[in-house]
């Protein structure tokens, strides 16, 4: 896999990182629209959410969105040396596997990430920017998937 174009990633992330919760909510709303079976995996204090809107307005889930956006921020910060995040990302993979997330769902997360970036950036979300983010996300998922394979 080619290395992502660092400057395209950083430049586009600057716009997103100004409002991470807002943009992260767009990402997860899209994720639940594409893969509604993921909604039951999100439970806090034994509370089952009745709808994506219910989940997306929950303070506990908003905290999860913040954490996801911090992981993306770490990947952007380390875009030229993602190996420095290898152990952390593999451990995230293990955690996601333990709660029942399927590895195949990360493809839908990637689609949702690209959707959010396109909505945030508008015309600045060029084909080159899309390709750079696809490469970065692919590398992150590759590292996380190692968590599925290890105990």
From Swiss-Prot:
The keyword Iron applies. GO terms for molecular function: GDP-dissociation inhibitor activity; heme binding; metal ion binding; nitrite reductase activity; oxygen binding; oxygen carrier activity. CDD domains: Ngb. Gene3D superfamilies: Globins. PROSITE patterns: GLOBIN. Its EC number is 1.7.-.-. It catalyses: Fe(III)-heme b-[protein] + nitric oxide + H2O = Fe(II)-heme b-[protein] + nitrite + 2 H(+). InterPro entries: Globin, Globin-like_OT, Globin-like_sf, Globin/Proto. One of its GO terms (biological process) is cellular response to hypoxia. GO terms for cellular component: cytosol; mitochondrial matrix. Belongs to the globin family. Monomeric globin with a bis-histidyl six-coordinate heme-iron atom through which it can bind dioxygen, carbon monoxide and nitric oxide. Could help transport oxygen and increase its availability to the metabolically active neuronal tissues, though its low quantity in tissues as well as its high affinity for dioxygen, which may limit its oxygen-releasing ability, argue against it. The ferrous/deoxygenated form exhibits a nitrite reductase activity and it could produce nitric oxide which in turn inhibits cellular respiration in response to hypoxia. This is Neuroglobin. It comes from Macaca mulatta.
């Amino acid at each position: 896999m080619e290395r992502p174009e660092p400057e395209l990633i950083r430049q586009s992330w600057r716009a997103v990182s100004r409002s991470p919760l807002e943009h992260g909510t767009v990402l997860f709303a899209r994720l639940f629209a594409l893969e509604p079976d993921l909604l039951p995996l999100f439970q806090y204090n034994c509370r089952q959410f009745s709808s994506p809107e219910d989940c997306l307005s929950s303070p506990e889930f908003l905290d999860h969105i913040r954490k996801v956006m911090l992981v993306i921020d770490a990947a952007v910060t380390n875009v030229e040396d993602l190996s420095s995040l290898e152990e952390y990302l593999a451990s995230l993979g293990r955690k996601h596997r333990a709660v029942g997330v399927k590895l195949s769902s990360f493809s839908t997360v990637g689609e949702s990430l690209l959707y959010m970036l396109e909505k945030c950036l508008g015309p600045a979300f060029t084909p080159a920017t899309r390709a750079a983010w696809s490469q970065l996300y692919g590398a992150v998922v590759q590292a996380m998937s190692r968590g599925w394979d290890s105990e």
